[in-house]
């Protein structure tokens, strides 16, 4: 349903943001 796809999109965006944050930390280390 709508909520399931919304949660999936939010989870995907959060995962991408977390991955970017980790990559930035590694690059600065």
From Swiss-Prot:
Disulfide-linked positions: none
Sorted UniProt keywords: Amphibian defense peptide, Antibiotic, Antimicrobial, Secreted
Signal peptide: none
GO annotation, cellular component aspect: extracellular region
Stored Pfam families: DD_K (PF12121)
Gene Ontology biological process: defense response to bacterium
Cell compartments where the protein resides: Secreted
Tissues where the protein occurs: Expressed by the skin glands.
Family, as annotated: Belongs to the frog skin active peptide (FSAP) family. Dermaseptin subfamily.
Job of this protein: Has antimicrobial activity.
Protein name listed in UniProt: Dermaseptin-J8
Source organism of this protein record: Phasmahyla jandaia (Jandaia leaf frog)
